């Protein structure tokens, strides 16, 4: 893309054929007539000839012209004067038009022209095999640079604001978690006060759960990472806090399951008690097997069991 440098005024004047500062042909002819030397002898003879020839050859200024001729002469003189004035106005208008300066509002700005000239120079240099290094500040106008700076500042401000928001949100979550834990502890203490005191078996279970929870939750222990999120460790904590304990069956007067005294909710599977008894040694009825081989001893044990 290139900018046209042709002046439209010069084109218009060249087509009209008018040359500024030079006299026209009418003025040149009048000047030539005025510059010619006059021959007084010829003028005197011509005046005598016209006088001797009678009234038909009299000087035009002494002739009696009819009224129509007078009106025609007056009209011709007025038309000549009007044409002269019009021509003079026409020349003045051309001079004014030639001196007039036109400012095109749609013309490209100076910064853009400069940048485009650098772009053309750069393209020419690339075609010649010698690239021209153009700085980043010359490739972009100043207003675009200011827009980029403002955009970078806005992005930095938004990033810092987002980080601060995340930090505040994390602090709020920690505060809420602490408040929930404190409220949970208060509720647990309240429920423990409302429930009936523990009997001997429930107290022993609570002490055992406290010992297990203290051992497994120790950070220095090698097994702490394995039990940190286990349900078993959570159950031991609830038993040690008194939230969960043994439930006794009033009909059998035995503990059958785990439950929460505050809510009455049952935890785990149903408990089935196992009767404690000692079984006799099955080898007492077989006798001595020391003198037998392994196959004979196995056959004897099998027959006795059947």
From Swiss-Prot:
There is a cross-link at residue 4 (Glycyl cysteine thioester (Cys-Gly) (interchain with G-Cter in ubiquitin)). Its main location: cytoplasm. It is found in: Cytoplasm, Cytosol; Peroxisome. InterPro entries: PEX18_PEX21_C. Residues 172-203 are annotated as: Disordered. Disulfide bonds: none annotated. Keywords: Cytoplasm, Peroxisome, Protein transport, Thioester bond, Transport, Ubl conjugation. One of its GO terms (biological process) is protein transport. Gene3D superfamilies: 6.10.280.230. Monoubiquitinated at Cys-4; acts as a signal for PEX21 extraction and is required for proper export from peroxisomes and recycling. It holds the Pfam family PEX18_PEX21_C. It comes from the Eukaryota. GO terms for cellular component: cytosol; peroxisome. Belongs to the peroxin-21 family. Mediates peroxisomal import of proteins containing a C-terminal PTS2-type peroxisomal targeting signal via its interaction with PEX7. Interaction with PEX7 only takes place when PEX7 is associated with cargo proteins containing a PTS2 peroxisomal targeting signal. PEX7 along with PTS2-containing cargo proteins are then translocated through the PEX13-PEX14 docking complex together with PEX21. Interacts with PEX7. This is Peroxisomal protein PEX21. It comes from Kluyveromyces lactis (strain ATCC 8585 / CBS 2359 / DSM 70799 / NBRC 1267 / NRRL Y-1140 / WM37). The gene is PEX21.
């Amino acid at each position: 893309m290139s900018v046209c440098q042709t002046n439209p005024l010069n084109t218009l004047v060249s087509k009209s054929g008018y040359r500024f500062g030079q006299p026209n042909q009418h003025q040149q002819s009048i000047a030539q007539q005025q510059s010619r030397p006059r021959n007084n002898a010829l003028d005197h003879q011509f005046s005598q000839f016209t006088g001797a020839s009678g009234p038909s050859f009299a000087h035009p200024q002494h002739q009696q012209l009819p009224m129509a001729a007078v009106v025609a002469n007056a009209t011709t003189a007025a038309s000549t004067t009007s044409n002269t004035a019009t021509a003079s106005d026409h020349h003045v208008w051309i001079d004014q038009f030639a001196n007039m300066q036109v400012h095109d509002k749609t013309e490209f700005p100076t910064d853009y022209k400069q940048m485009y000239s650098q772009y053309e120079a750069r393209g020419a240099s690339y075609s010649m095999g010698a690239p021209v290094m153009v700085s980043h500040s010359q490739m972009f106008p100043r207003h675009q640079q200011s827009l980029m700076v403002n955009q970078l500042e806005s992005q930095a401000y938004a990033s810092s604001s987002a980080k601060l928001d995340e930090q505040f949100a994390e602090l709020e979550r920690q505060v809420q978690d602490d408040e929930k834990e404190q409220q949970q502890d208060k509720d647990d203490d309240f429920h423990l006060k409302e429930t009936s005191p523990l009997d001997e078996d429930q107290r022993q279970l609570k002490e055992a759960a406290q010992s297990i929870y203290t051992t497994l939750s120790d950070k220095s222990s090698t097994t702490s990472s394995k039990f940190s999120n286990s349900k078993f460790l959570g159950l031991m904590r609830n038993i040690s806090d008194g939230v969960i304990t043994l439930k006794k069956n009033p009909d059998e007067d035995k503990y059958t399951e785990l439950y929460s005294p505050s809510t009455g909710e049952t935890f785990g599977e149903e408990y089935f008690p196992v009767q404690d008894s000692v079984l006799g040694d099955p080898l007492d009825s077989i006798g001595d097997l020391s003198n037998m081989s392994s196959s004979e001893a196995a056959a004897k044990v099998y027959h006795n069991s059947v």
